[in-house]
């Protein structure tokens, strides 16, 4: 769920997709790392995703491409939900310049990645999971919960006696 790259575009051309994918590969380090399994692109069947230009670009990068079933947005459920959440936030204000909109999106992505807890990932932030801190945080929460319960039991026993 961690958003590693995004780009505000005025069109939905294949070049916009490849530039955004380049940003994602650079941010993740996959553009320079020697990995056994390159990332795969999961997309819908929009014109920019079914183009020969994108297929060639993915081939050059040795990346796979999985397309969701037509008229079945649930395949891309996580990113569709993210787009809906972003859209709901963005529509709260008016933006008169693209730079204002970009700044708001950047702030939202930072909040989404680092501050917003997700129930579906054990109330961790996407950054916690992406950077491998999730298990340590969950163990720490469990220790705190155990100590709190012990403290409450002790207080209850003192009060009951």
Set out the residue ranges of the language-model regions:
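RNase H-like DDE/DDD metal-dependent nuclease/strand-transfer catalytic core used by mobile genetic elements
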Residues: 2-111
